């Protein structure tokens, strides 16, 4: 194909609280810097996201996109007689329109189900029209699309559902996964399908799926103004080094229940608070647990933190704790928040070596067992007692590791196989 001028990204975009909605933003912004003239994020109407029960940021805290990035939220097609396909039909229809105008286009889908499935359907329709189609596709598997769809389909003996996702994935020009762990998970799940039905998905996945780590915009985390850090923290009633931080979705797999128990057992509570930042399906349950804790007066929940404030909270914490644990519905396939914390250069990271977290942490975090509040307590106490020079040295090593996930580096590696010539850096 000719050098692409348009990038279309299909994703659950802002205001969804998800590292991959942020990744989509970062790749879109980098595409502008690399010479793409038309960058579009095709996503779901906000009311549909609300109805789905996804954790959402406050709309007034969502940062604007740069000029040149268009966010499209296609309206549903059909009426009440189409019970569960109206919104997907709107997205597929819009993709068909973008794929048939002859503009050289790269289409990147994040989440195989339903986004890569939608791209595969739209391409089939686009080719059938006889109109000019000049599209290269990339599908990025984030992990939960395997654990939440393919594995469930295999467990329930639903071959068709698993085959639908895997075949749509392999129909794309380029297949990537967000970590080595995720790649192995895909191959393993495909092998289960093959063993039951005599298919050959695993061999194809093993041969074709590469790794593309999530793209993070490192700029907001680097060289933070010290006075501004203090000002942002003071506005929340906090001071540098006075709190232990959790920042992610409030879901069972994130281990916040263990963190609350661990904090109340720690000696660090004598001089620190626990700040829990995020929204999610377990929020009410976790607030109730915290209220019943004997450390209740030291635990704060913040549900209105936007992307602009996040780096300052990370930079000022005494320790950052993400005690994720594997669940049937979710496994941490990378750990974007861990990489962001390392870029911010705050206190030590405490986490669990589950899923792809080890790839994000790169040996620069304190690894503890899952489901172990006592281990969390010990790790917090060790972190807050660490001498300042050791904290600084650890932060410098961690940041050097995390810089490989900067959006420009990730974009260039991903698109090196796609673009027919080296990317042009915008002035």
Report residues per predicted region.
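Nucleotide-activated donor-binding/catalytic signature segment of Leloir-type glycosyltransferases, i.e.
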Residues: 123, 284-309
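Nucleotide-sugar donor phosphate/pyrophosphate-binding loop at the beta->alpha transition
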Residues: 123-140, 144-168, 191-197
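Donor nucleotide-sugar binding/catalytic pocket of nucleotide-sugar-dependent glycosyltransferases
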Residues: 136-139, 162-231, 300
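Conserved donor-binding/catalytic core segment of Leloir-type glycosyltransferases
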Residues: 176, 216-218, 233, 237-254, ...
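A charged, aromatic-enriched C-terminal amphipathic alpha-helix characteristic of glycosyltransferases
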Residues: 254, 371, 388-420
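Acidic donor-binding loop of glycosyltransferase active sites
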Residues: 315-330, 347
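Short hydrophobic beta-strand element within catalytic cores of glycosyltransferases
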Residues: 338, 343-351
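Conserved acidic donor-binding segment of nucleotide-sugar-dependent glycosyltransferases
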Residues: 351, 363-374, 382-388
């Amino acid at each position: 194909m000719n050098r692409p001028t348009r990038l279309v990204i299909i994703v659950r975009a802002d205001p969804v609280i998800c590292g991959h909605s942020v990744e989509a933003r970062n790749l879109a912004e980098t595409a502008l810097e690399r010479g793409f003239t038309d960058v579009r994020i095709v996503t779901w109407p906000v009311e549909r996201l609300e109805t789905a029960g996804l954790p959402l940021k406050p709309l007034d805290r969502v940062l604007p996109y740069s000029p040149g990035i268009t966010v499209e939220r296609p309206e549903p097609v059909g009426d009440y007689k189409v019970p569960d396909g109206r919104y997907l039909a709107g997205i597929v229809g819009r993709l068909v329109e973008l794929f048939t105008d002859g503009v050289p286009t790269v289409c990147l889908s994040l989440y195989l189900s339903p986004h890569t499935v939608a791209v595969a359907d739209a391409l089939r329709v686009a080719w059938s029209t006889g109109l000019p189609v000049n599209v290269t596709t990339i599908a990025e598997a984030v992990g939960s699309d395997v654990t939440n769809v393919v594995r469930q389909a295999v467990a329930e003996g639903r071959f068709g559902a698993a085959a639908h996702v895997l075949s749509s994935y392999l129909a794309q020009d380029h297949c990537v996964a967000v970590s080595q762990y995720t790649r192995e998970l895909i191959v393993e799940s495909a092998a289960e399908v093959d063993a039951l039905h005599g298919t050959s998905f695993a061999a194809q996945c093993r041969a074709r799926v590469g790794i593309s780590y999530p793209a993070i915009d490192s700029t907001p985390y680097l060289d933070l103004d010290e006075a501004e850090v203090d000002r942002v923290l003071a506005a929340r009633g906090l001071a540098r080094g006075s709190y232990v931080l959790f920042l992610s979705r409030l879901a069972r797999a994130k281990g916040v229940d263990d963190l609350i128990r661990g904090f109340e057992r720690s000696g660090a509570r004598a001089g620190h608070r626990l700040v829990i930042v995020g929204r999610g399906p377990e929020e009410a349950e976790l607030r109730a647990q915290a209220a019943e804790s004997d450390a209740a007066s030291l635990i704060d929940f913040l549900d209105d933190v936007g992307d602009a404030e996040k780096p300052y909270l990370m930079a000022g914490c005494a320790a950052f704790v993400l005690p994720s644990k594997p669940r049937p519905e979710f496994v941490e396939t990378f750990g974007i928040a861990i990489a962001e914390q390392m870029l911010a250069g705050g206190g030590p990271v405490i986490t669990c070596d589950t899923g792809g977290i080890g790839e994000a942490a790169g040996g620069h975090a304190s690894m503890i067992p899952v489901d172990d509040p006592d281990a969390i307590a010990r790790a917090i106490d060790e972190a807050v007692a660490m001498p300042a020079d050791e904290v600084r040295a650890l932060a410098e090593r961690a940041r050097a590791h995390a810089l490989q996930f900067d959006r420009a580096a990730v974009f260039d590696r991903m698109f090196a196989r796609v673009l027919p010539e080296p990317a042009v850096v915008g002035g």
